[in-house]
Amino acid sequence: MSKNKLSKGQERRVQANHQRRLKRTDNKPELDDSQLGEPQDGIVISRFGMHADVEAADGTQHRCNIRRTLRSLVTGDRVVWRPGVGTHAGVKGIVEAVHERTSVLNRPDIYDGVKPIAANIDQIVIVSAILPELSLNMIDRYLVACETLEVEPLIVLNKIDLLDAEARKTVDGMMDIYRHIGYRVLEVSSQTREGMEAFEQALADRISIFAGQSGVGKSSLLNALLPPSDKQILVNQVSDVSGLGQHTTTAARLYHFQHGGDVIDSPGVREFGLWHLEPEQVTQAYVEFRDYLGGCKFRDCRHDTDPGCAIRGAMEKGDIAKERFENYHRILESMASVKVRKNFTDAAG
């Protein structure tokens, strides 16, 4: 007797259930109270399934089991853990509780919803570069994410050494768009170290996460900032001619900068999906729009070609950058497109 073919959505759910059963039957070592020391505070350096690397107050790192009652644990979480008496199959302790987060960075996934990928972030470093391409649209997307998450952004333009004087002047003008609306912008080079001292100062005493497209030099910057003992973030071979790199990071991990501050390097922030946001949230995330909200002729103004739009009027007078205004509508269009695909996928499942 023939069986009906499973839809893609059903196949995903079957596979997910199978993986959950595998985890439940995993014979990982368990530590009871007699094998555990006193509770102490620590920070999650990295997460691996039902294990986490936890850094203790003295700087030592310990591979720990995670209590099954802890549903969400990510890099950057401040936790209560108990060291084991000895080592059991490579496990040195157990994470028992998670302190309240000051912030959480979520990654929207078209299939699995919104997932946390890092916690207690103080700032998001938006790394862009003049090669492979300086994309103001991508910077604006990251800024929307930062404003929505209420995490302070820092815009860093890398590979500035590849510009001649005329091109440098043009790029400075583009970056002034962001300086004029209150964002911090640094222009740096990991090769010549131009701007790196100011960058180090901006990173001190904070937990940062680097965001940016592949090839903008995130890993090169991190390696320039990390102490020699921690240079585990590798960059694929880079052409001296093109100056282009490739994304190589594979797992979220917290590192300590040699001049102070920490970074969580995660593959989950190559791009921020914004499809889970409402259009009103994107509008609010444009800081220069806020003074004009409520000033439009119509309450349901889309801030496009609507008559009496205060935001478009401000753009036409030069009070709002045309580039930012156009990217605002590109973001809304891309969000609508992804939502259509997601709704189609959900219906197919």
Curated annotation (Swiss-Prot):
Enzyme class: hydrolase
Cofactor note: Binds 1 zinc ion per subunit.
GO biological process, one term: ribosomal small subunit biogenesis
Main location: cytoplasm
EC number: 3.6.1.-
Residue intervals of the CP-type G domain: 102-272
Localization: Cytoplasm
Keyword annotations: Cytoplasm, GTP-binding, Hydrolase, Metal-binding, Nucleotide-binding, Ribosome biogenesis, RNA-binding, rRNA-binding, Zinc
Any one GO molecular-function label of the UniProt entry: metal ion binding
Positions of region (Disordered): 1-38
Cited CDD domains: YjeQ_EngC
Residues involved in Zn(2+) binding: 296, 301, 303, 309
GO cellular component: cytoplasm
Cofactor(s) required, per the database record: Zn(2+)
Residues binding GTP, per UniProt: 158-161, 212-220
Disulfide bond residue pairs: none
Protein purpose: One of several proteins that assist in the late maturation steps of the functional core of the 30S ribosomal subunit. Helps release RbfA from mature subunits. May play a role in the assembly of ribosomal proteins into the subunit. Circularly permuted GTPase that catalyzes slow GTP hydrolysis, GTPase activity is stimulated by the 30S ribosomal subunit.
Record text on subunit structure and interactions: Monomer. Associates with 30S ribosomal subunit, binds 16S rRNA.
PANTHER family: SMALL RIBOSOMAL SUBUNIT BIOGENESIS GTPASE RSGA, SMALL RIBOSOMAL SUBUNIT BIOGENESIS GTPASE RSGA 1, MITOCHONDRIAL-RELATED
Stored NCBIfam families: PRK12288.1 (NF008931), ribosome small subunit-dependent GTPase A (TIGR00157)
Family: Belongs to the TRAFAC class YlqF/YawG GTPase family. RsgA subfamily.
Record protein name field: Small ribosomal subunit biogenesis GTPase RsgA
Gene: rsgA
